[in-house]
Swiss-Prot record:
Top-level lineage group: Bacteria
Gene3D superfamilies: 3.30.70.2860, CinA-like, MoaB/Mog-like domain
Signal sequence range: none
Protein name: Putative competence-damage inducible protein
Recorded family membership: Belongs to the CinA family.
CDD domains in UniProt: cinA
Species annotation: Streptococcus thermophilus (strain ATCC BAA-250 / LMG 18311)
InterPro entries (alphabetical): CinA, CinA-like_C, CinA_C, CinA_KH, Competence-induced_CinA, MoaB/Mog-like_dom_sf, MoaB/Mog_dom
Lineage start: Bacteria, Bacillati, Bacillota, Bacilli, Lactobacillales
Length: 423
């Protein structure tokens, strides 16, 4: 279905007001699976509006007119639409009663003949009641084209759309359903290359990639008449994506860490720690507490996080985590050794199930011969300790610190999932 929005009002063309209704309606129609092809604005002029309606009726299936339903002489939307369709204007009983009630409770207000037009609808139209104002809207289908008239003020338009128009449209149209897959460990351009065939051949469902700092999301969208139908279609596409091999032969499934628009690696780790009844601590150098702050963002963090350490200098690493200073000097603070000893020391001191540690070069200058963006992340549990090295190149200092925490959370997530598989 092709939809078109027509904003009626000279004040829009002269820049006196901003057409926020177009954005609101476009978002709502997209949620219903209705594609908006055109945005049009026309002044308060019958001939020009008739010309626009003639054009719209030839290229769109759904034409929504906003504004021009009031009592003044330049409010001519309903009259012009009725003329275009060759129909009369008639009074809607419910809207007329509301008008009667309005003036009955306001005896000082004079009820003039032009007020009556607010209760009129195009003959044959289904009324759309105005929950916050007096001007009734309407919806009518003629020769395969559906026309909708809505009031201009957003305070009246939005309730009418949400409570009157959307139910009317969803009786006969599909809804847009979406599922968001979240990836870590692959860039947007690389991911798009990997699933190029799926993107090129997409029809319904569709795939839309979005790059975020340190991660990528794929929004899978489909038009369906129910959530169950949508899930069936999205399940098929998701499985195709998961089974696709990366450039180094791995499964894309291994790079998907979760679902949802507002999900995060930090939340996934928090959820898994609670699920398995595990606790974690952290010792941070370059990230200076960023990992710990991310855990503490979630209500109930005290169930999984006992406390942690920010050991920025070599001396504090030695003093707070019981690492021999001579060994730190020998291996350097930017090393596998230091990351592992930090993780192990933090875990032992707090008697936590997991200890995570981050040490490295946030930049912009190099340190100990390591380029900016070089990070060592250690992880310790009650049985073993290990570490990884990552190089986050071409990023700002703040990005290096943030992306480092993502790698740390992903390392913990993988460890927790391995523990789940061993149960």
């Amino acid at each position: 279905m092709k939809a078109e929005l027509i904003a009626v009002g000279t004040e829009i063309l002269t820049g006196q007001i901003t057409n926020t209704n177009a954005q609101f309606l476009s978002e709502k129609l997209a949620e219903l699976g209705i594609d908006v092809y055109f945005h049009t604005a026309v002044g308060d002029n019958e001939n020009r509006l008739l010309s626009v309606l003639d054009q719209s009726s030839k290229r769109s299936d759904l034409v929504i007119l906003c504004g021009g339903l009031g009592p003044t002489e330049d409010d001519l939307t309903k009259q012009t639409l009725a003329k275009f369709l060759g129909k009369e204007l008639i009074f809607d009983e419910e809207a007329s009663k509301k008008l009667d009630s309005f003036f009955a409770t306001r005896p000082k207000h004079t009820r003039t003949p032009n007020n009556e037009r607010q209760a009129q609808i195009v003959e044959g139209a289904v009324p759309l009641q105005n929950l916050t104002g007096l001007a009734v809207g309407g919806i009518i289908t003629v020769e395969g084209v559906t026309y909708v008239v809505l009031p201009g003020p957003p305070s009246e338009l939005k309730p009418m759309v949400n409570q009157e128009l959307i139910p009317a449209l969803t009786e006969n149209h599909t809804t847009l359903y979406s599922r968001v897959l979240r990836f870590f460990g692959v860039g947007e351009s690389q991911l798009v290359t990997i699933i190029k065939d799926l993107i090129v051949n997409q029809t319904d469902p569709t795939i839309a990639p979005y790059a975020k700092v340190g991660e990528v999301t794929l929004r899978l969208s489909t038009k369906a008449s129910s959530q169950e139908e949508a899930d069936r279609k999205l399940d098929v596409l998701e499985e195709q994506i998961r089974s696709t091999k990366t450039l180094d032969g791995k499964s894309l499934s291994d790079l998907i860490y979760g679902y949802g628009e507002s999900n995060s690696l930090a939340y996934e780790v928090f959820y898994l720690l609670k699920k398995y009844g595990k606790t974690i601590t952290a010792a941070e150098s370059l990230t200076a507490g960023l990992f710990q702050a991310s855990v503490a963002d979630f209500p109930g963090a005290s169930q999984v996080f006992k406390g942690g350490f920010v050991t920025y200098s070599m001396e504090e690493k030695a003093k707070m985590l019981d690492i021999p200073l001579s060994k730190l000097e020998e291996h350097g603070v930017v090393s596998h050794f230091t990351a592992e000893k930090m993780a192990e020391g933090a875990r032992v001191k707090t008697d936590s199930d997991y200890g995570i540690a981050l040490t490295g070069v946030a930049g912009p200058d190099a340190l100990e011969g390591h380029q900016a963006g070089t990070v060592f992340i250690g992880i310790a549990d009650r049985n073993q300790v290990r570490s990884i090295k990552v190089v986050i190149g071409g990023r700002s200092r703040s990005d290096v610190r943030y992306i480092s925490t993502l790698y740390a959370f992903n390392l913990v997530r993988q460890a927790l999932l391995q523990e789940d598989n061993s149960i």
